[in-house]
Amino acid sequence: MNRVYSVSDINNYIKQLVSNDIILSDVSIRGEISNFKHHYTGHMYFTIKDKNSLLKCVMFRSQAVSLRFSPENGMKVIVSGYISVFERDGQYQLYASSMQPDGVGALHIAFEQLKEKLQREGLFDPENKKKIPVLPGSIGVVTSSTGAVIRDIINVTYRRNSKMKLVLYPVAVQGQQAAGQIAEAIKCLNEQNKVDVIIVARGGGSLEELWAFNEEIVARSIYASNIPVISAVGHETDFTICDFVSDMRAPTPSAAAELAVPDMEVLLYKLESYNMRMKSSLAKKVTTLKNQLQKLNARPFFAQPYDRVNQQRQTLDNLTKSMVRENQTIIKDKKSQFGMLAGKLDALSPLKILERGYSLVKNPQGYVVNNVKQINIGDKLEILMNDGLAECDVISVREGKIYE
């Protein structure tokens, strides 16, 4: 009877066969990525496939951090590593040690991926660009402390304005440490707040040599800067992420200095030109005002001003006399109307009635009695006459008109 093996035995045996295979121990495979998953641990799990087959792959975090691009489903790649068996599931898979795009370079893909990402976030939008000051007091320069770049910037700066202050923040401009140093330099210049504009500069080079200026950390530090930033990386045909996010791009470091530093000779020439134009404009204005003043002086009023004043004074006197006459007439009419009203009121006075022989009767409460219904027998009444007062007691009351 044949020997009976466990599943683990067979899987382990197959693993040993595969692991000892000289081809499978170091292999590069071309395929299209599918089912890509970037685990929170940093590991990458995916499948590469062609028209007829597929192969499961895993890339652990220690290798994944070295990738210059972000793998995506549908991307054609060349994956290098070794084939082994995952004993638990009995599946063979490729353990990837490196990966690169098939055809287009990894750096180029990484560049396009980051560019698209930052563009979606609005880091390149024109409305977010800050204006470069016309007359900066000092300029910060983020570049290497040695080489042609800093010399060119210094030469151009002092040729255009010998009194301009330059603040150099030296950094590495290529290599693994460069991106972090550049971002930190921009941050520090903002914290110190002693410069009015920042130039981030580097000379020409390959995509790999310029790569620090394509790193996301540099792009975000430029975007977060409160101080305007001019990018001057590489030659005129070189474009970096730094160029897109900066407030202004210069084709070369020398051009950046020309954009940041105003030419004092040109400024003085413009100032003199403005001064001459202002004097000319002021002279024309004075001449115009003199002509207007002469025309005014030629008018009769200004030629004989006292005659005009006397005429107005006579007019004022006439108006005053007219107003006095009108007021006197109005007062006279009002006095007459008042006298007539006083006469009417006097005729209606109770005292006038008493003078004509009539009398006035009041009850004990002091009210005038004008009908017998207000009187009761026994009431004491006051009778007012023109020449005195009489008090009487009511002994009888009769209703009816006694004079009919």
Swiss-Prot record:
Catalysis performed (reactions): Exonucleolytic cleavage in either 5'- to 3'- or 3'- to 5'-direction to yield nucleoside 5'-phosphates
One matching Pfam family: Exonuc_VII_L
Stated role: Bidirectionally degrades single-stranded DNA into large acid-insoluble oligonucleotides, which are then degraded further into small acid-soluble oligonucleotides.
Protein's GO biological process: DNA catabolic process
Compartment(s) of residence: Cytoplasm
Listed NCBIfam families: xseA
A cellular component term, taken from the record's GO annotations: exodeoxyribonuclease VII complex
E.C. no: 3.1.11.6
Annotated family: Belongs to the XseA family.
InterPro entries reported for this sequence: Exonuc_VII_L, Exonuc_VII_lsu_C, OB-fold_nuc-bd_dom, Succinyl-CoA_synth-like
Key word Cytoplasm present: yes
UniProt key word Cytoplasm: yes
Enzyme class: hydrolase
Keywords, in A-Z order: Cytoplasm, Exonuclease, Hydrolase, Nuclease
Protein name listed in UniProt: Exodeoxyribonuclease 7 large subunit
